[in-house]
């Protein structure tokens, strides 16, 4: 029960309770991740303990921000193997989670996980972030856009802020050192209709890892010119 106790402690740290039923869903998720990872590149993290800490607990820590408890709709942009979107959906069944990924094989995996876990509050979409944000049913439609993708804040802001409603939030799950990155993304955040609200440090149980939740509030509409076409966002970040 070591992992259960560890995850319970992590959940309690952010004001949540982890039920046995929720824990069992996480274990099924872990097993599917390990099984599928042998044929589809989903994660470099494959050991039980590492998955629990670096994927599950890291995702649960998003709830340190009350926005994740209060939001009705969330989009996880570039979700990959489903982080943080699926853990968020497991912990809060009142939030409707949209998982967005550009690789069809990963979307197939996400659909399987959603089915096996019986998650009625999750839908997976196959699309590039730049393309999805131009769809009327997705653009400026979510209380939260989140991402744990490996990209700098300027790039992530252009990928994510177009999905956020006015007065909603873009919340990025970042590593330990974000100060310089935040400074460099100031123009991008402002241009895209956002305002930096907070940088919130979180600790991962039973590790020395410290991560940051970067919180951006959407204060005005995103200009129609954004996001730019595929490729331009990463090649020429807004500076």
Swiss-Prot record:
**Which residues of this UniProt protein bind S-adenosyl-L-methionine?**
78, 83, 129-130, 148
Q: Name one GO cellular component term.
A: cytosol
Per the annotation, which location comes first and is thus the protein's main one?
cytoplasm
Its subcellular locations are:
Cytoplasm
Q: Which CDD domains match?
A: AdoMet_MTases
InterPro entries, from UniProt? Answer: rRNA_ssu_MeTfrase_G, SAM-dependent_MTases_sf
Q: Name one GO molecular function term.
A: rRNA (guanine-N7-)-methyltransferase activity
E.C. number: 2.1.1.-
Question: What general EC class does the enzyme of this chain belong to?
Answer: transferase
Q: Which domain of life is it from?
A: Bacteria
Family affiliation: Belongs to the methyltransferase superfamily. RNA methyltransferase RsmG family.
Function per UniProt: Specifically methylates the N7 position of a guanine in 16S rRNA.
Q: Which HAMAP family match?
A: 16SrRNA_methyltr_G
What is the protein's name according to its record?
Answer: Ribosomal RNA small subunit methyltransferase G
Q: What is the lineage of its organism?
A: Bacteria, Bacillati, Bacillota, Clostridia, Eubacteriales
């Amino acid at each position: 029960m070591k992992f259960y106790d560890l995850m319970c402690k992590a959940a309690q740290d952010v004001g949540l309770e982890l039920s046995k039923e929720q824990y069992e869903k996480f274990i099924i998720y872990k097993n599917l991740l390990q099984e599928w990872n042998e044929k589809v590149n989903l994660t470099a993290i494959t050991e039980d303990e590492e998955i629990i800490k670096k994927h599950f607990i890291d995702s649960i820590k998003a709830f340190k921000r009350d926005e994740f408890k209060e939001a009705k709709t969330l989009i996880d942009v570039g979700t990959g193997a489903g982080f943080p979107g699926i853990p968020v959906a497991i912990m809060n069944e009142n939030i409707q989670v949209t998982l967005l990924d550009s690789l069809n094989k990963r979307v197939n995996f996400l659909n399987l996980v959603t089915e096996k876990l019986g998650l009625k509050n999750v839908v997976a979409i196959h699309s590039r972030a730049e393309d999805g944000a131009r769809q009327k049913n997705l653009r400026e439609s979510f209380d939260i856009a989140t991402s744990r993708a490996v990209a700098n804040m300027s790039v992530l802001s252009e990928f994510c802020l177009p999905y956020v409603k006015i007065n909603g939030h873009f919340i990025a799950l970042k590593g330990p050192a974000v100060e310089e990155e935040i400074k460099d993304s100031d123009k991008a955040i402002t241009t895209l209709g956002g305002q930096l609200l907070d940088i919130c440090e979180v600790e991962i149980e039973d590790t020395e890892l410290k991560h940051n939740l970067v919180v951006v509030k959407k204060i005005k509409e995103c200009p129609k010119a954004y996001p730019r076409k595929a490729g331009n966002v990463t090649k020429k970040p807004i500076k």
